[in-house]
């Protein structure tokens, strides 16, 4: 009965294993992995109303919470520690970095001592892939675009493994994040020494947003996982962007000319995608033909509103939102209204595509290469 009650809402909760009975000699004080955890997220970012309801619940439970922010921030240039220019951008173009924000007061729970101190000191901690891509070392500066287009130089305080940073490209404290225009919270993290049903009941009672899903999320791999931005850049190339109207952007001409191509595909006809899309896309479409499933790909929908290469941000975000994988030409929307039968989804999965139908914010028309 309780499970049915909890699964009637739409926030995602994951509870880490209870470690309270582990050998005390292995316990490290003030490290988040030593606590039971609930993570709360929504499609896009947390509504302000949901944020306030989480805070009310946490206050009633007398427990701990922090909010994680995220946005894509423009990178205008980088400089070495001696102020010599390292990387520059084209006129009116910027690179984009996926930046995470965290409260200074809790940073020790999530990062090693040196990284935590760098974040408190208004420096940026960056991932190894990002440091390699932009030739950055500790003491160098990234010149990011903040509010009112102000260029804000931020010193690199530490370089850490991408997995340790959560596959973001950089992390800064909340105060610095506000200067960069990062106000959205994408996740709340609640932690305590022992989390039980009372926590979930309290959250259920207080969170009024109807489109919320409360689930116990086990440590199982989602077969529709997607590549983080750092790995997308590593595999398919990095490009500068120029803003256009609304969510649309212009990608760097040199990258576009090298990577975006037109080619005739089975079933779909002429398609415009990244050059590395051809083999897996053609393989999936040929298998659909071989199994006699081509009638389930609705070509009228594909021709009217589907597509592959479409340089834009993700629609649900305003400026600062993630760059869509369509901007790399590694995602394709075919049936924009009708959906797909399970076997078609399986075929695309087998050829290396994630399907958007099982995401927190379902995108049932969408297949994305990884």
Segment roles from a protein language model:
Residues 35, 50-51, 55-57, 73-217:
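Basic-flanked hydrophobic alpha-helices used for secretion and membrane insertion
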């Amino acid at each position: 009965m309780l499970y049915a009650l909890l699964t009637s809402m739409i926030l995602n909760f994951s509870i880490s294993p209870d470690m309270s009975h582990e050998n005390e000699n292995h316990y490290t004080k003030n490290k988040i992995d030593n606590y039971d955890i609930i993570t709360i997220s929504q499609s896009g970012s947390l509504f302000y109303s949901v944020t306030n309801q989480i805070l009310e619940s946490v206050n009633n439970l007398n427990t701990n919470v922090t909010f994680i922010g995220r946005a894509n921030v423009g990178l205008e240039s980088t400089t070495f520690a001696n102020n010599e220019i390292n990387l520059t951008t084209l006129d009116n173009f910027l690179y984009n970095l996926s930046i995470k924000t965290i409260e200074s007061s809790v940073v020790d729970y999530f990062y090693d001592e040196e990284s935590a101190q760098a974040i408190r000191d208004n420096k940026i901690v960056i991932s190894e892939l990002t440091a390699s891509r932009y030739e950055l070392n500790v003491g160098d500066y990234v010149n990011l675009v903040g509010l009112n287009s102000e260029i804000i130089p931020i010193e690199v305080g530490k370089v850490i493994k991408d997995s340790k940073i959560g596959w973001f490209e950089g992390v800064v404290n909340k105060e610095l994040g506000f200067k960069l225009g990062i106000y959205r919270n994408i996740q709340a993290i609640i932690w305590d020494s022992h989390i039980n049903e009372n926590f979930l009941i309290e959250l259920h009672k207080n969170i009024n947003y109807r489109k919320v899903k409360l689930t116990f999320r086990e440590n199982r791999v989602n077969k529709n996982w997607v590549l983080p931005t750092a790995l997308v850049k590593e595999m398919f190339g990095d490009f500068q962007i120029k803003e256009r109207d609304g969510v649309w952007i212009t990608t760097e001409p040199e990258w576009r000319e090298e990577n975006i191509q037109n080619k005739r595909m089975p079933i779909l006809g002429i398609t415009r995608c990244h050059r590395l899309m051809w083999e897996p896309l053609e393989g999936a479409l040929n298998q659909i033909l071989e199994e006699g499933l081509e009638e389930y790909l609705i070509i009228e929908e594909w021709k009217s509103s589907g597509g592959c290469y479409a340089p834009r941000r993700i629609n649900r975000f305003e400026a600062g939102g993630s760059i869509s994988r369509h901007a790399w030409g590694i995602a394709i929307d075919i049936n924009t209204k009708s959906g797909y039968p399970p076997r078609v989804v399986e075929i695309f999965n087998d050829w290396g595509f994630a399907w958007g139908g099982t995401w927190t914010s379902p995108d049932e028309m969408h297949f994305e290469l990884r």
